[in-house]
A protein has these predicted regions:
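Long, His/Glu/Asp-enriched segments that create or flank divalent metal/ion-associated functional microenvironments
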Residues: 1-250
Length: 250
């Protein structure tokens, strides 16, 4: 995590709150097979984010435990840390809590928040954060995963796809074992339309960055763009675009 913090100093202002790495609570492991993030409560003086990491289940039989451990590949850690902590969720959500606007502190949309975190996985590839071909490969696997979530989100909630079919699709197209895929699909079923927001948000943010770059010309600075974007908290990307003067008000 310290490597990503060092790089992000060149890309955005760092918030003051630290983040703890803790084991995922047992009541969440059925929905979170790998990792997740919980921001600090807004009105507490002690601002501490939590990066939850789901550990392999020690109660599984040896063969099942080995399959689960294969899903917890060390080469995926770099992109996961970038997504959940710096420059991803922790940086964005804690920065939002420090804003003066109550609306920007409290309201957020998954297209902005999850789009930002997935954008950050790619951003760290652009900065050279991934030091091995395997780390870069898993960043691209994550990108494929989010594209597959679009297919499954739409399929499960509007096309009659069953949970079993969704699990089969994941196992066929991704390096994921069945138990973890089942946990993922349970979450997809519980949160309609949320899962497609990762890919849609990343697409919208990349488009916004290019339009901002074109408007700034030779004066474009990546950190200035990120600081301006983070100043909108988790508001919709369309509102950030309008606020930056790149489009008529939605």
């Amino acid at each position: 995590m310290s490597r990503s913090m060092g790089l992000i100093l060149l890309l955005a202002a760092l918030p003051g709150a630290p983040v703890d790495i803790v084991a995922t609570p047992s009541f969440l492991t059925a929905l979170v097979p790998f990792a997740s993030y919980e921001p600090p409560p807004i009105y507490l003086d002690a601002q501490q984010g939590r990066f939850y990491v789901t550990e392999p289940d020690p109660s599984l039989p040896p063969e099942a435990a080995a399959r689960q451990r294969r899903g917890h590949c060390r080469h995926s850690i770099a992109a996961m840390v970038a997504h959940e902590t710096y420059p991803g969720h922790h940086l964005q959500l804690v920065t939002a809590q420090e804003l003066g606007s109550e609306v920007r502190r409290h309201l957020w949309t998954p297209v902005m928040v999850e789009g930002w975190a997935l954008y950050c996985e790619q951003l760290m590839a652009e900065t050279g954060y991934y030091t091995t071909p395997e780390q870069r490969l898993f960043q691209l696997v994550n990108l494929l995963w989010r594209a597959i979530r679009v297919v499954l989100d739409v399929g499960l909630h509007t096309r009659g796809m069953t949970a079993r079919e969704a699990v089969d699709y994941m196992v066929e197209h991704l390096p994921i074992e069945r138990r973890s895929a089942e946990a993922e699909v349970r979450r997809y079923c519980a949160w309609p339309t949320y899962q497609l927001c990762y890919a849609v948000g990343r697409r919208d943010l990349l488009s916004l960055r290019e339009d901002y770059r074109a408007a700034a010309g030779d004066g474009f600075e990546l950190r200035r763009f990120h600081d301006a974007l983070l100043g909108y908290g988790g508001l919709p990307v369309s509102l950030a675009r309008w606020g930056m003067g790149l489009e008529e008000r939605p």
